[in-house]
Amino acid sequence: MNYKYTYESPLGTMIMLGTLTYLTDLFFVDEAHAPSYDDAEYIEQLTGPFEVTIMWLDQYFNGKKPFITPPIQLEGTEFRKSVWSILQTIPYGETTTYGDIGKKIAKQQGKDRMSAQAVGGAVGHNPISIIIPCHRVIGSNGKLTGYAGGIERKKYMLDLEAKHK
């Protein structure tokens, strides 16, 4: 059985998708790369993973580093999963670059280097926005680039984290 739930964040409406056991997607309704899903296949219900997700988001948007993470289940290629795994290690209030993530992936795979563009593609298709902090990835020149939820949201979240670091 598939479930969904709507969350009203300070940055706009978000949709949670998942099962009784896991959160599988969290996204802004208007973001690029939002998953397409058949609404008829989802029951609108507050599940255990969604309750934990709401606690996490409430803490986050109140300027606190969340202390509990919802159980997540990621679907994607091995490459994307490895990028998403690295994203989860970026500390609250800090940033990294696409190139730095590429170097980590290359090292994991025993390669000399990895394309920052390939990393950017995986980052841009992160299924669990905010909790898997793709908004903490910036360009090598320090500029804010490419957040599926929009640059203004990315700036808001980075400013929020910097203020409460």
Task: Name these PLM-found stretches.
Residues 5-13, 55, 64-165:
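Nucleic acid-binding interface residues in structured DNA/RNA-binding domains
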Residues 20-69:
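Compact structured core domains
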Residues 1-24, 32:
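DNA-contacting interfaces and partner/effector-binding or oligomerization modules
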